[in-house]
Amino acid sequence: MTGLSRERYAALYGPTTGDRIRLADTDLVIEITEDRSGGTGLAGDEAVFGGGKVLRESMGQSRATRADGAPDTVITGAVILDHWGIIKADIGIRDGRIVAIGKAGNPDIMDGVHPDLVVGPSTEIIAGNGRILTAGAIDCHVHLICPQIMEEALGGGITTIVAGGTGPAEGSKATTVTPGAWHLARMLEALDTWPLNVVLLGKGNTVSAEAMWEQLRGGAAGFKLHEDWGTTPAAIDACLTVADAAGVQVNIHTDTLNEMAFVEDTLAAIKGRSIHAYHTEGAGGGHAPDIITVASHPNVLPSSTNPTRPHTVNTLDEHLDMLMVCHHLNPSVPEDLAFAESRIRPSTIAAEDLLHDIGAISMIGSDAQAMGRIGEVVLRTWQTAHVMKRRRGALEGDGRADNNRARRYVAKYTICPAVAHGLDGEIGSVEVGKLADLVLWEPAFFGVRPHAVIKGGMIAWAAMGDANASIPTPQPVLPRPMFGAAPAAAAATSVHFVSPQAIEDGLADRIDVRRSLIAVADCRHVGKAQMPLNDAMPRIEVDPDTFTVRIDGDVWQEQPAAELPMAQRYFLF
């Protein structure tokens, strides 16, 4: 019997069970725990495409028609990195959804072929061999200031945005809000042709229940409470009361100046109800200096925005300039400068690193163009994981690989925001039945630039060479829009998430969109315990004078990183 070395097998079919993969140039290593597409027990029957290879007529390709159930697309031999595990498999896609994760091929001549992965003449092949597959990222904090952010989002592996805004209006530049039914309708129409799923947030800063209900009927899938509109205890209570009745999520940016409430007053107004706390550390806004303590509470779903991820020697200086612009402050006014400086605290930014690593802060978003970079959600997440491994070593249960840490961090921009916003029945993980919103990465470029972004089963964005070249690979290889980004295809492969009330009120008949409208699931029961791998609730204390942070009684010392991976090695600027 002829055998193959691991090196030879990986070169032919990609790595298999027991093989380890380094993520970009970080210190993070993942290990494949199961191979459903080949390896031991299935070796020799791997489904691979190409000249002289397996997936040919009457070999790996069967006679099965689409009517017989053949998938539209099979991704072969990809290493799936998701919150539920790290395995290798073939992935089948049909009608824009994942139909199977297992072994693809022709059951007439091959063993172990999954019944929903029978390759036929109608099946396209995407080679995932040697590549990593993740669920499309969900950016849970996006300001809709300019349409060009959609391109940056796709280029960073994002396939869903939780967003608000109307363009470069002052309200949108500062707050994640699309206010009122008219603006909601126009923005749903404007976003129809982009290959991204969209969740729009209405304005929750009001004590008028009807003002919120009309926004829900107009297409809002949740609300945003922002201090620049007045996040008073009365507005918090009124907004959550409507949200409870409607089944939608509320996202909050609390009162930095503590004019209307302190953190204790805000928590009292929330009354134990589910709420998504944006930029929980506080540099992006929120009760100074102790908003970070809300991450201790079982009903609060905490997230970070990416400029503070991870804490580096440049973080503080950059934030002061960002803050002055984003909140229309005047550096010559002492009160404005004091406002800015009260929000930028190295001790809480440093503590944010640790809270992510132990799973106490559950999500990471961008705060796009309003103190955040939409193209760096995935990148900043893995930089944080790298910094924490260097400082803290392996997590419990990790040893020769960092599977537990990798699963925790990938969850922060996939399944956790999906659960928080009632989207997890449709997106957020690589699981059967969900939309095929998937990202393929070359391991050397993992988290930096995707090899391909698959939106609803169609390649929407990819690394592509010169279009006038004789083959696809000549330089310059750049992230470029693909056919899945064409307007009609984007509408066919993407969805607008709206409130159930919008569906019931016939919103689809009132607006000019081609994509499907899907109601968010009731997420009012969701608390920290429902955040996969990110459900820790340590005791967090902040000294009001020194801003020293204690986590379960221990002071976390500031050690800002002076050097990061996934940086100058990949980017000129």
From Swiss-Prot:
Catalytic site positions: 327 (proton donor)
Binding sites annotated in the UniProt record for substrate: 226
PROSITE patterns recorded: UREASE_1, UREASE_2, UREASE_3
EC number: 3.5.1.5
Pfam families per record: Amidohydro_1 (PF01979), Urease_alpha (PF00449)
Binding positions (Ni(2+) 2): 224, 253, 279
Subcellular location: Cytoplasm
Keywords: Cytoplasm, Hydrolase, Metal-binding, Nickel
Family, per entry: Belongs to the metallo-dependent hydrolases superfamily. Urease alpha subunit family.
Cellular component per GO, a single term: cytoplasm
InterPro entries listed in its UniProt record: Amidohydro-rel (IPR006680), Metal-dep_hydrolase_composite (IPR011059), Metal_Hydrolase (IPR032466), Urease_alpha_N_dom (IPR011612), Urease_alpha_subunit (IPR050112), Urease_AS (IPR017950), Urease_asu (IPR005848), Urease_asu_c (IPR017951)
Subunit comment: Heterotrimer of UreA (gamma), UreB (beta) and UreC (alpha) subunits. Three heterotrimers associate to form the active enzyme.
Name of the featured protein: Urease subunit alpha
Record lineage: Bacteria, Bacillati, Actinomycetota, Actinomycetes, Mycobacteriales
Residues binding Ni(2+) 1, per UniProt: 141, 143, 224, 367
Cytoplasm as UniProt keyword: yes
Disulfide bonds: none
Modifications the protein undergoes after translation, according to the UniProt entry: Carboxylation allows a single lysine to coordinate two nickel ions.
Modified residues (N6-carboxylysine): 224
Top-rank lineage group of the source organism: Bacteria
Cofactor mode of binding and number, as noted: Binds 2 nickel ions per subunit.
Cofactor: Ni cation
Metabolic or biological pathway: Nitrogen metabolism; urea degradation; CO(2) and NH(3) from urea (urease route): step 1/1
GO biological process, one term: urea catabolic process
GO molecular function, one term: urease activity
